[in-house]
């Protein structure tokens, strides 16, 4: 939850400063609740300390849910400085769409919770969730990014639709699902009919803005899968992509070229 909340700050090239924690614990005796609160706070503090972000308050409550519910409100400060001499770029056709991390966490956890895939597959997912977007956040201001979003609960395509709807030039995107990195176990889970709880909602929200250039495939379901601490998706100028990739490689940040900008008005074409 800590890394999940930080992704919004990182996606706008900002530095997290302070956080408020909201925590609901299942009903239990006071000793167990105190222990759980301490463990959650220690785990969150470890994440926020990496970003030099202070947890300076919050609220705790007891609820009827059997699982804890936790969230953070994070305040950040922009790392961008005004530079009147810097060349101004606008999003245009054939600019490059990049994704930094694997997707499929919703499918993996749904498959495990329903005993349809082995719990072994959660290992890589938890590693990515624990690492978060810390490394990218450290160097984001060095990159010439035209537009960026984090990939979380609404799934990849809904976040990408949000990305292009910000652009006044009425652009669209072409994406290649086979180029999208996915976690081990995702294909196995999809073959067994696994869907995450938010899949239908995400699909119904996006589908009228999606154009398929081919027959739909089962692997396309990853496009609508909700993510927890997903990576970042961003657009870079085509003529500068090698320069941007060199910066990412230098700082050992994962990146995958998954598509490009087209002239479709707020629509995504699936190839």
Positions of PLM-derived features:
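Short, compositionally biased
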Residues: 109-125, 251-254
